[in-house]
Swiss-Prot record:
Residues 1-21 form a transit peptide. One of its GO terms (molecular function) is GTP binding. Pfam families: DAP3 (PF10236). Residues 52-66 have a biased composition (Basic and acidic residues). This is Small ribosomal subunit protein mS29. The gene is DAP3. The keyword Cell division does not apply. The lineage of its organism: Eukaryota, Metazoa, Chordata, Craniata, Vertebrata.
Length: 398
């Protein structure tokens, strides 16, 4: 057996449970296995795994299952945050950032290309089982919008705003809410990196007073508000609220198209791990950051789109196998987002599975002598059930 020597190690990391796989059961696994038996090697491995078309706007069905390259410059400006940690490790290991073109992202790109900005923003929701690639599909969409010169409002993990926060301060604006200055300041730095070209063009439409000595006058660049939040960390939460309010208000003027992209959207409803000094729990709506982000999720503005993804990884107080919108959002969250267009992200299909294996082989990530064989591929299929995250983790040990 190809993986005999590492079975014990793998089992420590993830005990395989056939009951875990809801969408991709025995039938689907057998389908991919049959594909591996019957495939005819008419294309080179590189043609299977890669495309030379690196512009997301030009991606179509013909590119499905192939990897495209994100330039180092785009990686630095579009994704100062938001890429999954293990994908970042892979980028460093392979010295390149390659995303697979998948059907959920292609569906979203089709919708966004045909957006009518005169109508209220449409909400799209990526959902699926754990490890199927929701975050990377969201990143594909973000890359597309950035290359189309949209302004990107990206929240890479909303769960970080509702748990394990180091500093909570009573809001100076509303005593019933709490500020999270460190989280807000970090987000503003990344927002500035991605959208710096817009920050001098957009002017604030009212005066904002920070303290007795400092204020931002009406007509000042939005960049001044961002800088205030970065340099005066105590004001960072208020600065985020102002940025969101100004963008929502001005998106209809036609100066820019706005993408609101939120990963882990289910964090905005439900429970938090945060407590007051008297140990009583803090509700999400009591956090100023969450309060303001919830406003952005309403489709009472136009000039852009709202794309979000559900996440089990950081979700609190939810069953491990929950993945459906009504399960992770709860009634309050579901009602708040309704209506939305749901987009399912599933495990790899046969073409995607083969492409992923070939990509790892090209980068010498699979060193075992049986890795390129049909027997080896079937073992990897059995171990991972074609789940992208599990496949990546198992391949890391070969």
């Amino acid at each position: 057996m190809m993986l005999k020597g590492i079975t014990r190690l793998i089992s420590r990391i993830h005990k395989l449970d056939p009951g875990r796989f809801l969408h991709m059961g025995t039938q689907a696994r057998q389908s991919i296995a049959a594909h591996l038996d019957n495939q005819v090697p008419v294309e080179s491995p590189r043609a299977i795994s890669r495309t030379n078309e690196n512009d997301p706007a030009k991606h179509g069905d013909q590119h499905e299952g192939q990897h495209y390259n994100i330039s180092p410059q785009d990686l630095e400006t579009v994704f100062p945050h938001g890429l999954p940690p293990r994908f970042v490790m892979q980028v460093k290991t392979f010295s390149e950032a390659c995303l697979m073109v998948r059907k959920p992202a292609l569906e979203l790109l089709h919708y966004l290309k045909n957006t009518s900005f005169a109508y209220p923003a449409i909400r799209y929701l990526l959902y699926g089982e754990k490890g199927t690639g929701k975050t990377l599909s969201l990143c594909h969409v973000i890359h597309f919008c950035a290359k189309q010169d949209w302004l990107i409002l990206h929240i890479p993990d909303a769960h970080l705003w509702v748990k394990n926060c180091r500093d909570l301060l009573q809001s100076s604006y509303n005593k019933q809410r709490f500020d999270q200055p460190l989280e807000a300041s970090t987000w503003l730095k990344n927002f500035k990196t991605t959208n710096e070209r817009f920050l001098n063009q957009i002017k604030v439409q009212e005066k904002y007073v920070w303290n007795k000595r400092e204020s931002t006058e009406k007509g000042s660049p939005l960049g001044e508000v961002v800088e205030q939040g970065i340099t005066r960390v105590r004001n960072a939460t208020d600065a985020v609220g102002i940025v969101l309010k100004e963008l929502k208000r001005q998106s209809s003027l036609g100066m820019f198209h706005l993408l609101v992209a939120v990963d882990g959207i289910n964090a905005l409803w439900g429970r938090t791990t945060l407590k007051r000094e008297d140990k009583s729990p803090i509700a999400p709506e009591e956090l100023a950051l969450v309060h303001n982000l919830r406003k952005m999720m309403k489709n009472d503005w136009h000039g852009g789109a709202i794309v979000s993804a559900l996440s089990q990884t950081g979700s609190l107080f939810k069953p491990r196998k929950a993945y459906l919108p009504q399960e992770l959002l709860g009634k309050e969250g579901f009602d708040a987002l309704d209506p939305f267009i749901p987009i399912l992200v599933s495990n790899y299909n046969p073409k995607e599975f083969e492409s992923c294996i070939q990509y790892y082989l090209e980068n010498n990530w699979l060193q075992h002598e049986k890795a390129p064989t049909e027997e080896g591929k079937k073992e990897l299929l059995f171990l991972s059930n074609a789940n992208p995250s599990l496949l990546e983790r198992h391949c890391a040990y070969l």
